[in-house]
Amino acid sequence: QVNFSPGWG
């Protein structure tokens, strides 16, 4: 399961 949370940067 892959969850992309806002804040990758």
From Swiss-Prot:
Belongs to the AKH/HRTH/RPCH family. Hypertrehalosaemic factors are neuropeptides that elevate the level of trehalose in the hemolymph (trehalose is the major carbohydrate in the hemolymph of insects). It is found in: Secreted. This is Hypertrehalosaemic factor. The modification Glycine amide is found at residue 9. GO terms for cellular component: extracellular region. GO terms for biological process: neuropeptide signaling pathway. Keywords: Amidation, Hormone, Neuropeptide, Pyrrolidone carboxylic acid, Secreted. One of its GO terms (molecular function) is hormone activity. The modification Pyrrolidone carboxylic acid is found at residue 1. InterPro entries: Adipokinetic_hormone_CS. The keyword Chaperone does not apply.
